[in-house]
Amino acid sequence: MPQLNPSPWFFIMLTTWLTFSLIIQPKLLSFTPTNPPSNKISTTTKTTPWTWPWT
């Protein structure tokens, strides 16, 4: 079974993850988001429970 032989695919997987972790990820994290989070105060609304007819 060729899937059990890690020789061909393990090096490719390791190279891909190292490339992503060391090169691509820092470049992507340097961008500023287009919609930064705001300091809004969350408002909670008062809800009244619904009365069940059989209780």
UniProtKB/Swiss-Prot annotation:
Gene Ontology terms: cellular component: mitochondrial membrane; proton-transporting ATP synthase complex
Gene giving rise to this polypeptide: MT-ATP8
Chief place of localization: mitochondrion
Recorded GO MF terms: proton transmembrane transporter activity
Membrane topology: Single-pass membrane protein
Family: Belongs to the ATPase protein 8 family.
Record-annotated membrane-spanning stretches: 7-24
Biological role stated in the UniProt entry: Subunit 8, of the mitochondrial membrane ATP synthase complex (F(1)F(0) ATP synthase or Complex V) that produces ATP from ADP in the presence of a proton gradient across the membrane which is generated by electron transport complexes of the respiratory chain. ATP synthase complex consist of a soluble F(1) head domain - the catalytic core - and a membrane F(1) domain - the membrane proton channel. These two domains are linked by a central stalk rotating inside the F(1) region and a stationary peripheral stalk.
Protein's organism: Columbina passerina
Keywords recorded for this protein, A-Z: ATP synthesis, CF(0), Hydrogen ion transport, Ion transport, Membrane, Mitochondrion, Transmembrane, Transmembrane helix, Transport
Top-level taxonomic group: Eukaryota
Matching Pfam families: ATP-synt_8
Presence of keyword Manganese: no
Cell compartments where the protein resides: Mitochondrion membrane
Family annotation (InterPro entries): ATP8_metazoa (IPR001421), ATPase_protein_8 (IPR050635)
Self-association and partners: Component of the ATP synthase complex composed at least of ATP5F1A/subunit alpha, ATP5F1B/subunit beta, ATP5MC1/subunit c (homooctomer), MT-ATP6/subunit a, MT-ATP8/subunit 8, ATP5ME/subunit e, ATP5MF/subunit f, ATP5MG/subunit g, ATP5MK/subunit k, ATP5MJ/subunit j, ATP5F1C/subunit gamma, ATP5F1D/subunit delta, ATP5F1E/subunit epsilon, ATP5PF/subunit F6, ATP5PB/subunit b, ATP5PD/subunit d, ATP5PO/subunit OSCP.
Protein name, as recorded: ATP synthase F(0) complex subunit 8
Source species taxonomy: Eukaryota, Metazoa, Chordata, Craniata, Vertebrata
GO biological process: proton motive force-driven ATP synthesis
Signal sequence region: none
Keyword Transport (UniProt): yes
